[in-house]
Amino acid sequence: MATTPPHWTECRTELAARLGTVPRLLVATDFDGTLAPICPRPEDVQLPAAARKSLEALSNHPGVRVALLSGRELDNVRTLVHLPKLIYAGNHGLEIIGGGMDYVNPRSLDARPTLDDAARYLEEALAGIEGMLVEHKGLSLSLHYRLAPDNSAPRRDEAIASCATRFPGLKVHHGKMVAEFRPDVAWNKGFALKRLLKGLGLPAAAALYMGDDTTDEDAFAALNGLGTSLRVGPGAETGARYHLRDTDDTAEFLEWLKKLRVC
């Protein structure tokens, strides 16, 4: 893995050759931290107008499909973005709708009672700590602790470890100030991206994926070095080919891509 791949503006000619010549292109992207700045409270996040405008223009072009591959619940991210022609994949791809696809990972449905129990356990174990938020997303759980005091970390870590032990049917994944509990099934954003490509009849070379967190590395790897991958944010080891500084940079890249493909 490269520590920091080249910034996309250093590779415009290469990117134009990769993205401007394929007859049909899949533009797939994470949401929080990639398109929209992360907020302490997930419900406060909004899609910036510039990114929305570019995504809408790209999705209206017959040679482009746009997909959002988010850790959020599918209905939540679809409501936030509210662009009808997009493909939406929620819970890290455990559920997908759009582009002729209507998919829910069948094994993840069996985990719902366990997720209910795990959510109650975390809420009880962390009761009284201000800033701890347990978010039940139907097919997964997120424990957000961005707003919690630093001295709550030992109790938080103990609760996370204990929850993972008590509910072996769930697997814990750590992200940016969040611990996620997902059904322990062979599925991630990489598998979801491959399913999107198969459903659309596209090769990996016709795909672009952007993401900002460790969960996005599976999607980068799924492109097998053939597609175009961009990691958002500073200083992380990544398998992505290119680098975006932040969500503003993502908006600039999407504007450039819109001009390349649409205008």
Predicted segments — roles?
Residues 72-89, 151-171:
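Substrate-recognition/cap helix-loop segment adjacent to the acidic, metal-dependent catalytic center
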Residues 2-8, 22, 190-263:
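Mg2+-dependent phosphoryl-transfer enzymes with acidic/Ser/Thr/Gly-rich catalytic loops
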Residues 16, 46-137:
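Active-site phosphate-binding/coordination module
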